[in-house]
Design a protein with these regions (language model features):
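Glycan-recognition and catalytic cores of secretory/periplasmic carbohydrate-active enzymes
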Residues: 1-235
Length: 235
């Protein structure tokens, strides 16, 4: 598909081949088509959904798995986390083992070093998004390596908290700001940590998540019935 893709450096959309991830790309289209096929059961959309991942396979052949991580980052919106999520969920909906195997293969080639190098941290671009994708791979395939890496993601997130001006610890993400919200803020990271706590039962993940939620709540503006936009520049 050709799709409008936003380029932050240009502050405009450009028409180009759809990217690989969930947010505005092929993995997201695959999820929609797989859901549609699951509801209708006609067989009309199955091959189309599976075919959405052909560009991913082609890109891996060109740059390798390490190159893919460098190119896309880790996140759950546009990065490797989104590919893991898309492959695992689409494979489960369609009962397509090839996609589940691809999710497992991609997981096995991820390294703790790539997680340690991540500075984005958030759900769309960083470690929290990878964590959510890894948990889905573990849930759908039982792959132990996925949970091992998810724990490492959790440790990375806990280790990068800083004390906020209002008290609770949270994270610097987009443009170095301590944002709120699901995409780039404390809410998304806290959600990922709560999911990890659910999968492991380890209390430190829950405690870090609850402190992140306390940070979010401290910034709520009751008069506006909303949270302030703390971004320093447009996305």
């Amino acid at each position: 598909w050709i799709a409008p893709t936003y380029h932050p450096d240009l502050h405009r959309f450009l028409l180009q081949p759809a990217p690989l991830g969930v947010f505005s790309g092929n993995a997201g289209i695959a999820l929609f088509l797989a859901g549609l096929e699951t509801v209708l059961g006609t067989g009309e959309f199955r091959d189309l959904a599976v075919g959405c991942f052909a560009p991913l396979r082609a890109r891996v052949r060109q740059v390798g798995h390490d190159g893919l991580v460098r190119e896309l980052g880790l996140g759950g919106g546009t990065g490797v986390g989104s590919l893991l999520y898309g492959l695992a969920r689409t494979g489960t909906l369609l009962r397509e083992d090839r996609l589940l195997d691809q999710a497992r293969d991609l997981t096995m080639l991820l390294t703790q070093r790539s997680i340690d190098a991540d500075v984005h941290l958030d759900a769309v671009l960083g470690t929290a998004g990878l964590l959510l994708g890894l948990l889905v791979v573990h849930e759908t395939t039982g792959e132990a390596r996925a949970l091992e890496l998810a724990r490492h993601c959790g440790g990375h997130l806990i280790g990068h908290r800083i004390k906020s001006e209002v008290g609770p610890r949270a994270w610097r993400t987009l443009n170095g700001s301590m944002l709120t919200g699901l995409s780039h803020g404390a809410a998304g990271i806290s959600y990922a940590l709560l999911r990890l706590h659910q999968a492991t039962g380890q209390s430190e993940y829950e405690q870090a998540a609850l402190e992140g939620i306390a940070y979010e709540r401290s910034l709520y503006v009751a008069q506006a019935k909303n949270w302030p936009d703390l971004r320093r520049s447009p996305e």
